[in-house]
Amino acid sequence: MDETVRRMRLDWEIIHAVTSSSGTRYLHENADVYLPREPREIAKDGNDPWQARVNLSVLAPFVKRLISNAAGMVLRRSIQLEGGDPWWEEEFRKDVDGDGTSLDQFAKKRLEVALSYGMSSLIVDAKERKPQNAGDEIDPLRPYFVPVDPWQYLGSRRENDEPGAKLTMFRYQEEIKKPNGDFGEEYVLAARVIIPSAFQLYESDKPEAVSQGPLALDYVPLVNIYAEKEGYLCASPPLADVAYLNIAHYRRLADLLHSLHIAAIGLLVLEDYDGTEGVTGLNYAIRMNPNTKAYWVECDAGSFVAQAELLDRLENEISHLGITKLLGQKFVAESADAKRIDQQQANCVLATAARQLQDAMNEAFRMAGEYRGVEPPKAIISQDFDFYRLLGQDVSVLSDLEEKGQITTELLHKIMFHGEWIPEDVDLKELLANVKKLKEEAKKEMMDQARAAAQVRPAAGSAPAKSASGGNPRRLSVGL
């Protein structure tokens, strides 16, 4: 593992703790780090009070929810593919990784990883489809995207240290599933090395490559998505501060849950009692002397209130440090200017992430087009995160501009699409073709009506028709 990757992992660990799929289980497995043992929590006679506190702890997934909502806002609308071969829209976008993952699902996951660790990557690879029958034509290479998370990075190498130097090697870790016995299976750690025009695969316990082969491209087909770039293949998690607050919330919540668990059971005190019975409960009674006193001792609720207030404060801090406007909403009255400033700040972060993702998708499609040998499409990700719906008067003004020829019909449809007047499942290209056809039919109908009117209209210079009495034509007057 490269030293650069090793250093970045130190910052990634806190993010991995609060965003991993295992969630609370991961913190339980690493409780000595994230929920340290207190001095008096000493295991004795098989009882470990610290382990009891760990077992009651639960992680509130604040950071994970922040990231998921941020990615959802960026990809609120489906990614649009313009131009290129129809194969991209008809087939590829439905399965971009060879396992049935759609383009939108794949892009959302890549963006979530980038917002978590500061960057994410993908490898553009291709496989050859063999003809099913002898007479079938040879199918061109079928490209697909391979997701690579920062936690898989092992290292990279470039030609030199100059800016823009060519990437000559990229190494990352993966798990290979192998059969074990008749019905079982096992996972083996392996390192994949990609160099221009070739790849190699090494298993953890074997010094020689277990698999190797050529690549159709003469460069390393790696595409990176940055959210907090520090350098080439180097980034820092943008939500690290929020992650530390999330861990602080986890610790305080663990203390509160454990305290409530202990304090919920009161302690029975018997004064001047000489008996030996120690069993109490709803089905038991205690025989006491007339001078014996019995009462329950309970904890003061003031300490619990203070812990609950601290938890509320931590939750508010996490909300205010969120990068999305949804999770940063304030449930108090605000001025219009304050709301506008918050909106612009949120849009700035989301727009930057959207542009990074859009550039990465276009670069990936360019590489996939080289594999396929066809023209790649252009991916367009909506930059509108305001949920702003066009008003009726806005649509009327835009329609007037389109009729006067100041904007095109295609632009009008795009504005109405982003303004949520055109449903998302409507094909804009098909809609444009239908509108043009309707306009041509309406124009033709108007021309036909004009010709028909010209045929029945009196010729120019002809005398007006006389009335039946032979005089001038009778005029009708309407009294007002």
Cite the ranges covered by each PLM segment.
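Extended, helix-rich architectural segments
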Residues: 1-143, 148, 454-455, 459-480
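Conserved aromatic-histidine-acidic binding/catalytic patches
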Residues: 51-55, 59, 76, 110, ...
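Short amphipathic alpha-helical segments
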Residues: 88, 99-107, 114, 241, ...
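Long, hydrophobic, amphipathic alpha-helical segments used as structural scaffolds
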Residues: 107-111, 126-130, 253, 257-264, ...
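Extended, regular secondary-structure scaffolds
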Residues: 115-228
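Residues in well-ordered beta-strands of folded domains
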Residues: 123, 171-173, 287, 380-386
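Extended, charged amphipathic alpha-helical segments
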Residues: 206-338
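C-terminal helix-loop subdomains that flank or include functional centers
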Residues: 274-277, 306, 313-480
